[in-house]
A protein has these predicted regions:
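Membrane-proximal, proline-rich intrinsically disordered regions
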Residues: 3-57
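Solvent-exposed, polar/charged alpha-helical surfaces in well-ordered, non-transmembrane soluble domains
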Residues: 26-29, 33, 37, 95-102, ...
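Conserved alpha-helical segments that form or flank metal/cofactor-binding pockets of metalloenzymes
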Residues: 47-48, 143-159
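Short alpha-helical hairpin
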Residues: 54-78, 167
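Conserved, well-structured interaction surfaces
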Residues: 68-151, 178, 182-185, 197-210
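Short, flexible, mixed-charge acidic loops at enzyme active sites
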Residues: 156-171
């Protein structure tokens, strides 16, 4: 029709197909927006993440035995009452980031060409690419850091030899895959590698609501 149906083609930034659906730089910003949005949920920084640490320390106290967070306060959580929501969220966000990492390498840049980003910034394609990839690396590092803190032992317990969480750093087509857990040391190595690469890419500017250098 004359008014068009382009709005029907808008893709949710939290539900990305694995078949190479990301073809323009601005597509990758939508993926990052989805990651930031998911990180604000009640299973993560919107609520529970503060309880994981503070309720197990001296800063907070759970007064009701029926509280949904009493298991953290009493250190009596297991595979049935533990923080499962964050586990699923981590791998959901991680899947989208891995698609981003795969597809962003296929973009044919004109490095010096100036473009206008969805935030109305004037950047070269190379600057925009670097920002997007740098943010994605930093987000992946933060997610793995938090997962390792929640589901793994402290590094100093045994120099990182104990098991933490599986590291999934590429697109996995098999939905039934059951990867083995990596050690705490392996997780922290992946975290520091991602952050080191992110620092090299991010511009030294402040971006509201985004990860900054």
């Amino acid at each position: 029709s004359s008014c068009g149906n382009d709005w029907l083609d808008l893709q949710s930034s939290t539900a990305i197909e694995t078949d190479g659906s990301l073809t323009e730089l601005r597509d990758f910003e939508f993926v990052l927006n989805g990651a930031y949005s998911s990180m604000q949920s009640s299973s993560y920084y919107g609520a529970d993440m503060f309880c994981y640490g503070d309720l197990r320390g001296d800063d907070m106290k759970s007064y009701k035995s029926s509280s949904t967070n009493v298991s953290f306060y009493t250190f009596k959580y297991n595979k049935t009452n533990g923080p499962s929501g964050f586990w699923g969220m981590y791998y959901g966000i991680g899947k989208n980031l891995n698609i981003l990492f795969r597809d962003i390498e296929k973009i044919k840049l004109v490095p010096d060409r100036e473009i206008t980003t969805p935030k109305l910034e004037k950047l070269t394609e190379q600057e925009y690419y670097n920002d997007l990839k740098g943010e994605a690396l930093a987000i992946r590092a933060l997610l793995l850091f938090d997962m390792t803190r929640i589901y793994g032992y402290p590094y100093l317990k045994d120099n990182g030899a104990s098991l933490a969480v599986p590291i999934i750093d590429k697109v996995v087509e098999d939905k039934n895959i059951k990867p083995s857990r990596n050690t705490t040391a392996q997780c922290y190595k992946a975290i520091t590698d991602d952050l080191t690469d992110a620092v090299k890419l991010l511009r030294p500017v402040k971006k509201e609501g985004k990860i900054n250098k």
